[in-house]
Amino acid sequence: MELIANLHLGFTTAFTGANLLYCLAGVFLGTLIGVLPGLGPTATIAMLLPITFTLPPISALIMLAGIYYGSQYGGSTTSILVNVPGEAASVVTTLDGYQMARQGRAGVALATAAIASFFAGTVATLFLALFAPPLAELALKFGPADYFSLMVLGLIAAVVLAQGSLLHAVGMVVLGLLLGLVGTDVNSGLERFTFGIPELADGVGFVVVAMGMFGLGEIIRNLENETLRSEIVTKIAGLMPTKEDWKRMLWPTLRGTVLGSALGILPGSGSILGSFAAYSIEKKISKNSAEFGKGAIEGVAAPESANNAGAQTSFIPLLTLGIPSNPVMALMIGAMIIQGIQPGPAVINEQPALFWGIIVSMWIGNFFLVILNLPLIGMWVRIIMVPYRFLFPAILVFCAIGVFSLKNVEFDIYFMALFGVLGYIFTKLDCEPAPMLLAFILGPLMEQYLRRAMLLSRGDPTVFFRRPISATLLTLALLALIVSCIPALYKKREEAFREEQ
């Protein structure tokens, strides 16, 4: 009964005219940036953060959430029609989706992706409604030492699940933690790492870093390597799957939904892991495994359901623990802090309308996405054909205006440009910026909880090992780090044996 009452509160909040409009705007923008390869939800949300200052908290968060899960829908469109994934989570969809399109079944492939995404998004949101409240209740029992250990685990998980070199990921985390230290120490009043620059006394702006690393950095990278989009499937007919198609897509959609919902909670790239894992499992157990890579409908249904389910459940750590599971969730935490909301388990009790309004808006948003993705497919095809060289200058101007509007300080524009160049350099060096952003968000919070824990324990560092929850979390972090190091150590051992021979 309590769940029904909470959902009623959520529907009452989400079904206001303004929130419906912002939900529609969010999923529309999400679909748009998903359709355009190179423009991801991270860059888009980073660019829109300044706008959230002027919006009510619930409306702003509903819109930003819609951009995130809406981009998963849009990413499948380019995967199927152009063989270019709009989102990283849609990479697997290209394998069979594009082949279906070349066989004249583009409409069926698009409908399959939309239906699987809608089902997965709806079910995953139900999981969020069921499991988020108990987890939030558990989190209320956490002390400062437990929160510190939880954040250590989150950073270690981000390192373990990051793409590329483990050493690079650790380096990016350290850089993020150092950036979080810049500014005035709230306890001593002394400036740290400001190098005599007055504009750094308040610290490095989160929006400046996010816009630079993910917005401007992506623009530079994509202008250097503009994707060739010559083979675009424009003839689309017969959207409805056949009876045989329905049979073949049913179980892959169900399995992808469950798998994606579970992996979406993991820090890092849960939705990406979910789509790859779902595709691999279906390829192994399917009766039609020989058709995979040649236009199997299971190869579209499974990854699309998995990545959309993962996008929904990635909100669980954010709404219950205040821990971001991916860069987009880190930006969502930034948006909440901008609105004066302290992310964490207290949100469900102190602002239940906000908590349940966001959850219910996801159901509404998934319904909007089905309407946007199928009837308007002709419009998305025309948008795909817009050259980047015309699109990105407008985005660059928008970034500069957005950053300047926060404080009316010209220095922030130069700083954004600096982080844009750094983001581009990091990409060229195969250093994923996501762990840096997570560490930049969590660093000041970790420092705060570390000081509280040491103050309450009178300077006794063993408090982190004496508390059961904290000790368990630190043990898990250590195990994750050890497991991630084993392959590298094994590889070096093999290389040493080869040199001896």
Segments from the language model and where they lie:
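Alpha-helical transmembrane segments in multi-pass membrane proteins
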Residues: 22, 26, 30, 34, ...
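Flexible loop linkers connecting adjacent transmembrane helices
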Residues: 47, 80-109, 134, 143, ...
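Membrane-interface alpha-helices at helix entry/exit sites of multi-pass transporters
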Residues: 58-62, 99-116, 287-299, 330, ...
